[in-house]
Amino acid sequence: MDASRVQPIKLARVTKVLGRTGSQGQCTQVRVEFMDDSNRSIIRNVKGPVREGDVLTLLESEREARRLR
């Protein structure tokens, strides 16, 4: 793996749980706010139990999930 292309791991706090997604509802769509610059927030899909206030470790911080319909 090329070390120059590796992104740093970012911490993000769950600010709002938006709903369930996936073919069987196995993922939860959440809005997260980055802890290093708190004015930036994105929507991510999370697998497993999650609630507001949880801190997620994001290996890929640029990818954003499509919104629920």
UniProtKB/Swiss-Prot annotation:
Cellular component GO terms held in the UniProt record: cytoplasmic side of rough endoplasmic reticulum membrane; cytosolic small ribosomal subunit; nucleolus; ribosome; small-subunit processome
Signal sequence interval, chain numbering: none
Places the protein is found: Cytoplasm, Cytosol; Cytoplasm; Rough endoplasmic reticulum; Nucleus, Nucleolus
Modified residues (N-acetylmethionine): 1
SUPFAM superfamilies in the record: Nucleic acid-binding proteins
CDD domains, per the entry: S1_S28E
Main localisation: cytoplasm
Function: Component of the small ribosomal subunit. The ribosome is a large ribonucleoprotein complex responsible for the synthesis of proteins in the cell. Part of the small subunit (SSU) processome, first precursor of the small eukaryotic ribosomal subunit. During the assembly of the SSU processome in the nucleolus, many ribosome biogenesis factors, an RNA chaperone and ribosomal proteins associate with the nascent pre-rRNA and work in concert to generate RNA folding, modifications, rearrangements and cleavage as well as targeted degradation of pre-ribosomal RNA by the RNA exosome.
Designated name of the protein: Small ribosomal subunit protein eS28
Taxonomic source organism: Danio rerio (Zebrafish)
